[in-house]
Amino acid sequence: METSVSEIQIETKDEKRPEAASPQKERQERKTATLCFKRRKKVNKKKAKAGSKTAEETEKHAPEAGGSGQRQPAGAWASIKRLVTHRKPSESAEKQKPSEAEMQPEDGALPKKKTKSKLKIPCIRFSRGAKRSRPSKLTEDSGYVRVQGEADDLEIKAQIQPDEQATQAKSTQGLQEDVIVRDGKEIQESHISNNVISGEHVIGIELELEKESSALRMRTPGSEKEAKVILVKQGVQVQEASVLENSAADSPQPVTSTAPLSPATTHQLGLEEPSDSIRESAPSGKDDGRRKTAAEEKKSGETALGQAEEASSVSQADKSVLSQAEEATVGHTEEATVIQAQSQAKEGKLSQAEEATVAQAKETVLSQAEEVKLSQIEEPAISQAKKATVGQAKEAYVSQAEEAIVGHTEKATMGQAEEATVGHIEKTTVGQAEEATVGQAEEATVGQAEEATVGQAEEATVGQAEEATVGQAGEATVSHIEKTTVGQAEEAIVGQAEEATVGQAEEATVGQAEEATVGQAEEATVDQAEEATVGQAEEATVGQAGEAAVGQAEEAIVAQAEEATVGQAGEATVGQAEKATVGQAEEPIVGQAEETVLRHASDLKVNGVDAEKPRSEESKRMEPIAIIITDTEISEFDVKKSKNVPKQFLISMENEQVGVFANDSDFEGRTSEQYETLLIETASSLVKNAIELSVEQLVNEMVSEDNQINTLFQ
């Protein structure tokens, strides 16, 4: 019942607007409606007999109704006759169809045919007394005929109202059955004659509506669809009361509802208006009495049969219709509403709501266009701003990074340069200082040693040296020492020992030569030599001058010493002694020198006097310091007469009381062997003392230097 009532209510709403706006269309619709009602009333008498014939004829003329408004009533009658036998299933199934057709008006030829089938269902119900369903489905057919017969309906109502009042419902039903018994030709002719007046107008309007519907199907948005469907449901609920009043009052004009019209409902009203006009104009074609009887029959039929039939069919139909309506209304009602809205807009009948929606749509479109323009304008500005900010940030970051890198590199380079320069300066200064100190120490020590030794050696050795001692001792010892020590000196030379050995050798030669030379040499040369050797050894170890530089310095110093000593002390003994000292520079040299001395002493044993064997262990423990032993053998001479004989030498000789000298109280009978033993003893004692002192000093200085170096590295 809800679907049928909704259709009827929509018809009443739509009838208000077209009657006020275009009375001519309402007259045309009423004329066509009156004819339809007359024939339908006649059909109700004999609908079982002529159902098959009319169905065939309506099927033939159904395609013609899609092109013009004349064919629409014929299609409706044919559909009624076809569905008379299948009354109950057809009503429920076709109630669903009209709901879809109402939402899909004027979509083309196919939706028009569907609407005709919807009209067939109400005709069936009207014939049997289900009068509520009949007008609801007639409204669907009248959607196409509305524009055709509005003017004709008004004229027919004015002429036929007195006739309808006089006639009764029975006569109207008899007439309807008679008309149904007639051939389909008469039915079609009656429809055609009623619709001839507005046929041309209907065709033009339908063509326009079809074009508009095809053009606007895709334009309506989904949001409008949902809104329209909701409005249609509200209109249906509001208009149920008005439909009941129309059926009760049975007035010729449709009852209007006070509910506001939506664009979706306006279109459905436009489609369903002719059905109401037809329903009311049919009794006006004969009598007002017929109208009253028809109304009474409608009431009784609707209450009795409608409640029974519609209770089952409408409940099912409502469910299916609502489900299908919701699905179909989304796609089709929008097109229908848009089409009718455009048709009304052409005629100047747009409502305020439509104007508001149009204005809102325009505003939204304009706002969207403005937003698009603004976005297009803002995008380049934003991109430029981004580029500028990115460039500035990059520049700032690069500048900061450069500053940091430059500062860091400057610090690193400065630190490295400072370290390099400091190290270089330290190296250069140390090297220069070492060179200067070494040169100065060498010059001082060599000069002092040369002066002391040369002066003393010249006086003592030259006067004491004789042909015998030089020939015997010089040839034997010097030749043997040269062969052994010079070869060893070439293999290993140490600069630290050379300077000390030169001073010590000079001291030894001075001690062996004379007492004065021994005392002065011990005091002056030994002290100076120790200081010089210690300073030079420290400088050499710290600077690590190198073997080549040391060797060159040694050669120069030795050459100078050789020149002075050779010229002053004697060509043979002094030159050979210096060569021997140069070669004997290391520990093995010391041991070898001692061994050579022992060998030489053993070779020189003439009177059975044995030379003292030096302690090899002590010599090996000593640092590499060369030992110079000058064998200046003195032949027989008077010690008392000689002034240059050292006192220590004499004292040692007196204390030892050697067996050889026991018989000689005046020391006049001393031989060369005796002098040799004395010289060896004195030389060995002097060398031991000097070596011990120098070694201790060197060790202490080395330890102190190592500590200083470690502190610097830490």
UniProtKB/Swiss-Prot annotation:
GO cellular component: asymmetric synapse; basolateral plasma membrane; cytoplasm; cytoplasmic side of plasma membrane; cytoskeleton; dendrite; dendrite membrane; dendritic shaft
Ranges that cross the membrane: none
Region (Tethers NFATC2 to CRAC channels): 697-714
Sequence repeats: 305-312, 322-329, 330-337, 350-357, 358-365, 366-373, 398-405, 414-421, 430-437, 438-445, 446-453, 454-461, 462-469, 470-477, 486-493, 494-501, 502-509, 510-517, 518-525, 526-533, 534-541, 542-549, 550-557, 558-565, 566-573, 574-581, 582-589, 590-597
Molecular functions (GO terms): actin binding; adenylate cyclase binding; beta-2 adrenergic receptor binding; cadherin binding; calmodulin binding; G protein-coupled receptor binding; GABA receptor binding; glutamate receptor binding
Chain intervals with Polar residues compositional bias: 243-268, 310-323
UniProt cross-references to SUPFAM superfamilies, sorted A to Z: Phage fibre proteins
Renumbered residue ranges of the record's region RII-beta subunit binding domain: 675-696
Bias type Basic residues, positions: 37-50
Keyword annotations from UniProtKB, A to Z: Calmodulin-binding, Cell membrane, Cell projection, Endosome, Lipoprotein, Membrane, Palmitate, Phosphoprotein, Postsynaptic cell membrane, Repeat, Synapse
Chain intervals for the UniProt region annotation (Essential to the intracellular anchoring function): 1-164
Protein name: A-kinase anchor protein 5
Organism from which the protein derives: Rattus norvegicus
Encoding gene (name): Akap5
